[in-house]
Structure formats: structure tokens, C-alpha cells
Amino acid sequence: LIPIEVNIMKIKAVVFDAYGTLFDVYSIQVLAEAFYPGNGADIAAKWRDKQIEYTRLITQSDPHNATGSRFFRPFWELTRLSLEYTLDRLALDRKSGQVEKLMQQYAHLTPFPENLAVLQQIKAMGLTTAILSNGSVEMLTSAVKSAGMADVLDHLLSVDPIRLFKTSPESYGLVQQNMAVNKDEVLFVSSNGWDVLGATWFGFTTHWVNRQGLPFEALSPQPHFSGPDLHSVLHSLGTISNPPIPNQI
């Protein structure tokens, strides 16, 4: 654990990122490989990178508009455009039927296996649970229902109302706007280093789910907590007594 002073006993809500944290964005490569043999992993990686690049471009190009970025497009639309670009970049045929099937698969991404048990334990502690995501409410609702997690998540928060994506301060501010909590009462959980940085800068206590065993970003600050999967969130909350997880920061 990083020796940053934080009172974990003040935590009232645990807020999760969705894509990459609760849902495996790279699970799409199985279907992509079936459609485009030898290209599945490359499609999944480039698709995800372009998707995030588009969100940053939109937010950074018009960050001070009171009604959100005038360039804003819903995450679902950006996901489709990112897929189309990826296929074009790899010189692969954009057959409409295959694009539609990949998009539908994205709406029902594979959840990580520990999700439900961990969320149930967090709820049993009396804590509020939520998702904060670039995804639309419709996307999140579909993914959560298909994963059987609707009963263990109290809030599904989308950036759509503010028309600014993460890591804008306004995106993290949605937590306080929609939940009766202060910044220091929130544990924010994400597998994306850039998301953890944004949330830490905003003032949340943060937990980085380091599923790939990577070094954290060179840019500071470091996350308050880290571990290899969602079970480590329980460790951070003090609900289990285990020795330090080997690949914690």
C-alpha cells in the first residue's frame, strides 16, 4: 500500500469504473478473431485505444463550455466509430453484419468472475455502490443486467448529462451531485491508470485494480491502494485480514 494518509473508516461509498474494471473490454477479441482470423487481439486493443482517444479529444477541445463539449457524441456512437476506424486501419472488410454483431457483443461484455461476490460483500458492509462511466445509462444497464449485478449496484452514473468525458473534474463531480457523500467518503476503483489519476486529483480515495501486473504511471500521485483484482478492494476496506498482496504497489 502507498503510505498516503487516508481514513478508510470514513468511506461511505465505493464507486467503480465500468469498462476494464467490471467488464473485460478485451473479451471482444474472441468474436473478432472468429470474424477476422489472426486479428482478434489487435482489433480489441486498437478499438479500445481509439475509443478512449476520441473521448479525450472531445473533452479537451471544448473543456470550458457551460453546457458541455459542443463536440460531444455518446459513448456508444464513439465505440462504433472506433471499431470502424480500427477495421479500416487494419485493412479489414467492414461487413455491416459483422460490425453489428461486434457492437452487440460490446453491449454484453464478459464480467470479471469475482465481481458479484465482491459487490455483495461491500453491500453487506452497509456501503453504497455505484458505477461512474463514460458509457450511457443504456449501455451500463444492459451490461449490468446481463452480468446479474443489478441488485448490488445502487447507482449507474453516466457522463451523458454533462457532455464531458473522464478525466474532466465535472465527470467525477457527478458522484457528489447524485449521491449524498463528500469527496473523502468515496473509494473510487478503476483498472485504468489515467482514470485513477484523474480521480485522485479530484480528491477521491483511489484503488487501482492492476489486472495486468503493470507499473503505475510515472506521473504522480500514486493511488492510495492497489491490488490484482476486485478482491483487493475488500482488503483495502479492511474486511479481510491477508498478508500484503505481492503485486501491490
Language-model segments: which ranges?
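A metal-dependent, Asp-based hydrolase signature
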Residues: 41, 49, 54-100
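A short acidic, helix-capping loop that chelates divalent metal ions and anchors anionic groups
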Residues: 31, 54-60, 139-141, 215-218
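Short, acidic loop-to-helix structural element flanking the phosphoryl-transfer center
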Residues: 72, 76-80, 92-131, 141, ...
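Active-site neighborhood of HAD-like aspartate-dependent phosphohydrolases
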Residues: 9-52
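Short, Lys/Arg-enriched N-terminal segments with co-localized hydrophobic residues
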Residues: 1-8
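Asp-based, Mg2+/Mn2+-dependent phosphohydrolase catalytic module
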Residues: 9-14, 120, 132, 136-249
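Alpha-helical elements of Rossmann-like donor-binding domains used by nucleotide-donor carbohydrate transfer enzymes
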Residues: 30-31, 46, 81-85, 101, ...
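Short helix-capping segments at alpha-helix termini
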Residues: 36-40, 89-94, 124, 148-152, ...
